[in-house]
Amino acid sequence: MTAAEPTRADDDTAAPDPAHTKRGSDGERTPEPSGRLDGLKQKCLRHPVLLTTAVAAVAHILWFLFFANSGGDIAAQDAWAEFVGRHPGTAYNLAWYGGMHPVSYSVVSPYLMSLLGVRTTMMIAGTVSAGLTSLILYRVKAVRNPLACSMAGVFAYLCNALSGRVTFGLGMMFAVGATAAVFCWPYRWRYKRWAKAAVAAPLAGLATAGSPVAGLFLGVVAAALFLNKRRPGAYALGLAPVAVVALSAWLFPFSGTQPMSVATLSGPFVFAWLVFFLVPSDWKTVRTASAVYGVGTLATYIVDSQIGSNVSRMAMLFAGIVLLAALPYTTPRSRKWYAVVIAFASLNFWIGFKGVDDIVRTAPTASWTRSLGPLVNQLQKVGAERGRVEVVPPSSHREASALPHSVNLARGWNRQADMKRNPLFYDDTLDPVNYRQWLDRWAVHYVVLPQGDPDYSGARKEAELVGKGLSYLKLIWSNKDWRLFEVDSPVPLADPPATVERAGEGELTIHVKKAGRVLIRVPYSPWLALVDENGKGLERPRETEASKQRADENTPRTFVNENGCLLKVDEDEDGDEWTELLAPRPGTYRLSAPYQFQPGTPCPDELR
């Protein structure tokens, strides 16, 4: 199976069976009715892509009506969509982990999800992806059972929806579109390679902008094409994702680690090599991609990275399709035939079980929808918006989207960021002493313990500690759903001579009593800026005219700092790089992160 093979023609349809035709009065053969089932079958064979798209649409509508909830990955996507909806021009979300760039999650997904709705985006992405996958299967001549393989694809995309991976699904929609541009390019235009690249490369870039994981999977396909000396297709699919990742990492720095256990490794690794050994030997591109993916999966397990367990998604989406496509090439009831059937069945059991498990495990308790109001009311009464609030993460992670508009969360729902900034919840070292140190480090003023099961990773020990009682946590309010604790003598979010008036998700407002340096416990970002009451960035410190006209260029420059500026504090023992305000006078200062041509309000080196 290669990209260079001619594809099925656009109007390639199944010819009617001569046995089911009869000669009309004018001498022409006309189809003889052979039952509604045969008629339906012929229509399906004539329009397999349309049929697949319709089935996928129905499946995703059923998902929306009966299974979509507000927990798990959906909670994170709800949070990002709501954040960019409320603050479309802000580059830094202060309500999660002290501060996170939306772009570090996805470049375009939050904005599209805010515009279309998170669940609507999932339905569109899953449906279009299934249709494009069917198009690829139908157009590649090596696939003898494209309709059956298309239905396997529908099931895989439905399972992805069950797990709530909207951002990934959106990225895969563009990724499959880019792949279709390479593998389904009309044969009569086969020499117009620049036209193919002009279609595939932007889609590959959009795929990576939608989901870096989708861009990684395009890299697997690009590597397979490159190793098989199909360089134009490889460049079209592989260069744009690299550019998008490099640019976003440079402009919006982020680091973190996604965990990956041996159990998580086993699934994608085993199926990568099952595909490699079970598909026909002349499917060079498929076999090379499987080998690259298998080696890459092992490397992801060995080397900590932001990818981690996310690498399994390529096998979950496409291994079943490829295995089913290989089935007609085996002898019925031979050993290889049984191996393909068992592998295909095992793959679908795995992704089906995973989808159902994600729904059950992440379904929010009723308290998150029915009785959230009393908790929010209590948080407002005690002035929780002047510091951070730690909500012990429930299994649904519903707090990540339910509370950021009211208070700043010490955590959120991003496993990579959580493991990077809060390792004590994952390394089995959590105890009353270092928990207090952690509360002080992140300027946590209140702790909320919800009823229900905590997150299986990173919250069980915390829930146990808080539930049993700690000397520095005072229970100030509770009902059957929530327990609210106040931290004794909490560390302020901004050190004296400043006081915090409000810590919002898009803006931090502080009052400074006298000129000087103020340590603010917000992780530094080059986009952080001092803004006016309308959110517009203030002028940076400017060099004086005398300094510009100085005779000796080796003498230090002098600056006028009218509005204040921000410094990155040197990394401390916990790995934190906080923000420091250089305030020229007493008054109110507002920190935000507006998108602007010159990001932030940095202090020049001479003022450090």
Predicted features and spans:
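Transmembrane signal-anchor helices characteristic of membrane glycosylation enzymes that use polyprenol
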Residues: L45-G72, L247, L347-W350
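Membrane-embedded helix bundles of polyisoprenyl
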Residues: A56, A130-G131, L135, N145-P186, ...
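Active-site lumenal/periplasmic loops and adjacent helix-entry segments of GT-C-fold
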Residues: I61-A148, A152-M172, V176, Y191, ...
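Transmembrane catalytic cores of multi-pass membrane glycosyltransferases
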Residues: I61, A68-Q77, H87-T90, Y97, ...
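Internal/C-terminal transmembrane anchor helices
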Residues: S334-D358
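Membrane-interface junctions at the ends of membrane-embedded or membrane-associated helices
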Residues: W96, F183-K196, L227-Y235, L323-A339
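Start-transfer (signal-anchor) and selected internal transmembrane alpha helices
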Residues: M1-L62, L607-R608
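Extracytoplasmic
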Residues: V356-R608
